Design a protein with these regions (language model features):
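The two-metal-ion catalytic cores of nucleic-acid processing enzymes
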Residues: 1-277
Length: 277
């Protein structure tokens, strides 16, 4: 072709008014328009909202909620990079499988140990329905802001959900009874010369579920380090707990790009190749 020929480019901006359908919409467009280059399309909706509003997790300020329960306004008296900042006093319930060596689905008797307010309770009933009812009673009594589990993502939470579905007994894991659970599939990836397995996520609505066994950040720095990273990266706390430091750094770059009207290309990641020693 003539090197001096005019190259025509078509730019389209598409807005998705229902955030929960953002990823579905992107997948549909990518399937029907494979030759298009997409930008700002693979950023999670929650992070996009925080980039757009310049809010960040645990931002201290005044928030206005309308009659429908929607956020209608806010005045933030905080900075994401503040060294000293107030943190909310969170109610924490710990939850673990008594027999960690045996996956819950293979146990004849459901045995859970939950702890809150300095007291531990053993839920051990041969009738799984009774165990779920007792768990719901403790959830209502404690009303935790955070459920801290061991192996909750991989086995405990999925098992409780399947048990709840089978017995038709609603679980009160979410504060919002109309909300579902946010789950992702387990994955394996190659990095720094080795294959790493990562459990899928099991996140809640209205309260946080943090799996101490599926969070490098919680293992090394506990709540203080998690909160600091979530504020800096603008990644919601539950998701930040399960991500790597590299993902957090990428989010900080994306936030800067979004604020400065720089388009972020989708599908940027390339598989890592072997490197010489």
């Amino acid at each position: 072709p003539d090197s001096g020929a005019e190259v025509r480019r078509l730019d389209l901006q598409i807005n998705v008014h229902q955030p929960t359908r953002l990823q579905e919409t992107v997948w549909t467009l990518e399937r029907f328009f494979p030759h298009f280059a997409f930008f700002n399309s693979d950023i999670p909706a929650a992070q996009m909202y925080l980039y757009h509003t310049r809010l960040f997790p645990l931002a201290y300020g005044e928030y206005t909620i309308d009659d429908n329960g929607w956020l209608s306004g806010f005045i933030v008296d905080d900075r994401f990079d503040a060294v000293e900042y107030p943190c909310p006093q969170l109610t924490v319930m710990t939850m673990r499988n008594v027999h960690d060596t045996v996956a819950p689905k293979y146990q004849c008797v459901l045995q859970l140990e939950i702890s809150y307010d300095g007291v531990s309770y053993l839920l051990e009933q041969e009738d799984p329905g009774e165990a779920l009812q007792t768990l719901n009673w403790h959830l209502q009594r404690c009303d935790p802001d955070v459920i801290l589990s061991d192996w909750g993502d991989a086995s405990l939470m999925p098992f409780l959900r399947s048990l709840s579905d089978r017995l038709k007994i609603p679980l009160l894991l979410n504060r919002d009874p109309n909300a579902g659970y946010f789950t992702t599939k387990e994955s394996s990836y190659f990095t720094y010369g080795k294959i790493v397995h990562k459990d899928g996520a099991f996140e809640l609505a209205g309260r946080w579920h943090l799996d101490a066994q599926n969070s490098f950040i919680m293992d090394k720095s506990d709540f203080e380090g998690l909160f600091e990273l979530a504020r800096l990266t603008q990644i919601p706390v539950q998701h930040q707990a399960r991500t790597s430091i590299g993902t957090g750094l990428s989010s900080m770059q994306h936030s800067w790009a979004y604020r400065n009207n720089v388009l972020i290309p989708a599908n940027k990641r390339e598989p890592e190749d072997f490197k010489p020693a």
